[in-house]
């Protein structure tokens, strides 16, 4: 595992009155926080791509050049795959069976300082991360299970630090 820190330079605005997605980049479409963080990670790498909110999940990587999937607080793990799996384990198994990414990036940003921290994990590390820091809930349509990542916490940071030193 590696940890990368940088200061965000991508300009965005925050609109607390917008229904769901509160962030806008260059007066483009609204993004939720996860989409904003993915955009920041791409921008840091010199990539600018418009987010398509109509794509729930695809087998490709968020950052193709690194074969990397980007995740952050509150994200769903593979929403729309695994169908109506009876258990969370089946849903997680379907995700790992279908995802093509070999690197997984957990991204967190302090909005006051704009400091961004990326935690880069391989597949085995990410599987452990998923087992420790996700919760099971009903999806928004209440027809299937949703695997959601918990909020970024000090406990999570301690886990990342311990993994980075091993």
Question: What positions do the PLM features span?
Answer:
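Nucleic-acid endonuclease domains
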Residues: 1-166
